[in-house]
Amino acid sequence: MLHNTFFICETNQIMNEIEKAKGIILNRNMNDIWSALLIEVKKSNLIIKSTDRNIFFESTISIVSETDFKVLINASNFYDAVKAFNFYKKIKIVFNENNSKLEIMGELNDEKEEYEDHLKEPTFSYEEIENYNYDMVNEDYTFGIEIKQKSFKKVINRIAFSAHLDESKNVLNGVYFSKDEDSKLLLVSTNGHRMSICKTEVIVEEDVNFIVPVKIFNFLKHLMSGEGMVKIKFSDKKFYVEFDNYKIACSLINGNYPDYKSIIPKEQKNKSLVSLGILKDRLARVNLYVDKSRKLVLTFSELQLKLLGEDLITGRKGEFFIKDPNYLYDGADEVMAINISYFVEAISVFETSKIEIQFNSGNVLKLSEPENFNFTHLIMPMSLG
């Protein structure tokens, strides 16, 4: 064994990074290289790479090492091995090139004390490392911006939930990047029954017309600390983000995004202003009475908003009301039905004390913040019958 082919690191730190890296891996066949992590030791850094061949993940942490080397190892096995040593503050990981194994042991404070706890995990061959390797940094990116992490995380929270979760739905499984008439970066997502439209303050000069898989945004929002900046880049084929100690890229979705502008009503005759806290409370209560259809019936009138949930099979029925001063309405008396799950999820991303609800008779429900035109959410109505 080459005794200098090792590194020492904080146990909890590497365990957390491995857990994040293996989170995108879909392949569970331990003998397949696409179930593995690529571990690269470069000077005093450990680079952890993983991919599902659509999303590419890379994180970097500081370590103690003497020699640069690469190891490809099954992600789940490596995580379990490191987790088994979580009662050690630090661990030492040695690469045995002769038998292609990683040896993991607790790092002791007393150098005279011998190691007792240790594990050995098999690794893949050098040939398999070459088959696994990928480079996401040197892509020919043609478009790049920087945005505050806090702002981008907020945009993700408001956009990602509206996209279709079924990857077979192609463009509906993505987030559409465009720009508005003022050249501000605009993001849109829809599953065909609801839609989120979010405008940023980022000015872009280039033409923007990309569809990014929503999976990467659901992954990003759990990684971002909310501090510092995010670098965002696009090429003809890839979307790339870089922040903190992470670099993440994914392949773009090919296809034409639906004409979302044609769905947005130009003018709504009926407008209401509702206390967000009271609305959340009433929705939580009426949700107990909504059946599997998820149908919520809203009755708008001058004096009150009625929320009706009913199970036609069991006969259970719940009616809850919101009145002045928590409800103001300008419009004709109207009754409409919407999916309560969509409604609850949508209002959870609003941060103001009141929410505007606008609609035309029998048409799409538009949710927005008073005097804020940067975020709009649309919900298609359900049949009342």
Swiss-Prot record:
GO terms for molecular function: 3'-5' exonuclease activity; DNA binding; DNA-directed DNA polymerase activity. Gene3D superfamilies: 3.70.10.10, DNA Polymerase III, subunit A, domain 2. The keyword DNA-binding applies. It comes from the Bacteria. Keywords: Cytoplasm, DNA replication, DNA-binding, DNA-directed DNA polymerase, Nucleotidyltransferase, Transferase. GO terms for biological process: DNA strand elongation involved in DNA replication. GO terms for cellular component: cytoplasm; DNA polymerase III complex. It is found in: Cytoplasm. InterPro entries: DNA_clamp_sf, DNA_polIII_beta, DNA_polIII_beta_C, DNA_polIII_beta_cen, DNA_polIII_beta_N. Its main location: cytoplasm. CDD domains: beta_clamp. PANTHER family: BETA SLIDING CLAMP (PTHR30478:SF0), DNA POLYMERASE III SUBUNIT BETA (PTHR30478). Belongs to the beta sliding clamp family. Confers DNA tethering and processivity to DNA polymerases and other proteins. Acts as a clamp, forming a ring around DNA (a reaction catalyzed by the clamp-loading complex) which diffuses in an ATP-independent manner freely and bidirectionally along dsDNA. Initially characterized for its ability to contact the catalytic subunit of DNA polymerase III (Pol III), a complex, multichain enzyme responsible for most of the replicative synthesis in bacteria; Pol III exhibits 3'-5' exonuclease proofreading activity. Forms a ring-shaped head-to-tail homodimer around DNA which binds and tethers DNA polymerases and other proteins to the DNA. The DNA replisome complex has a single clamp-loading complex (3 tau and 1 each of delta, delta', psi and chi subunits) which binds 3 Pol III cores (1 core on the leading strand and 2 on the lagging strand) each with a beta sliding clamp dimer. Additional proteins in the replisome are other copies of gamma, psi and chi, Ssb, DNA helicase and RNA primase. This is Beta sliding clamp. It comes from Borreliella burgdorferi (strain ATCC 35210 / DSM 4680 / CIP 102532 / B31).
